[in-house]
């Protein structure tokens, strides 16, 4: 139950998603990995480049926007 959280910095704002545009799709880069791994995530609420997110699940990646 006590999974470690992963800090990730928002590097790029890709666009709005969701049926009414309530989520923002962003590209995040993990701060604790040595390989500089980046994934796309959907974020609810206000977010901009340079923000730090604490991700509870680091393996899940959002589908690409069309």
Curated annotation (Swiss-Prot):
Keywords: Cytoplasm, Endoplasmic reticulum, Ribonucleoprotein, Ribosomal protein. Pfam families: Ribosomal_S28e (PF01200). One of its GO terms (cellular component) is ribosome. GO terms for molecular function: structural constituent of ribosome. Residues 1-20 are annotated as: Disordered. GO terms for biological process: cytoplasmic translation; maturation of SSU-rRNA; ribosomal small subunit assembly. InterPro entries: NA-bd_OB-fold, Ribosomal_eS28. It is found in: Cytoplasm, Cytosol; Cytoplasm; Rough endoplasmic reticulum. Its main location: cytoplasm. Belongs to the eukaryotic ribosomal protein eS28 family. Component of the 40S small ribosomal subunit. HAMAP family: Ribosomal_eS28. This is Small ribosomal subunit protein eS28. It comes from Ostertagia ostertagi (Brown stomach worm).
């Amino acid at each position: 139950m006590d999974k470690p959280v992963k800090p990730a910095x928002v590097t790029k704002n890709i666009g709005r998603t969701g049926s009414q545009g309530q989520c923002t799709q962003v590209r995040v880069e993990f701060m604790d990995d040595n390989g500089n791994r980046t994934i796309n995530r959907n974020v609810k609420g206000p977010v901009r480049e340079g923000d730090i997110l604490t991700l509870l699940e680091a393996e899940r990646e959002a589908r690409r926007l069309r």
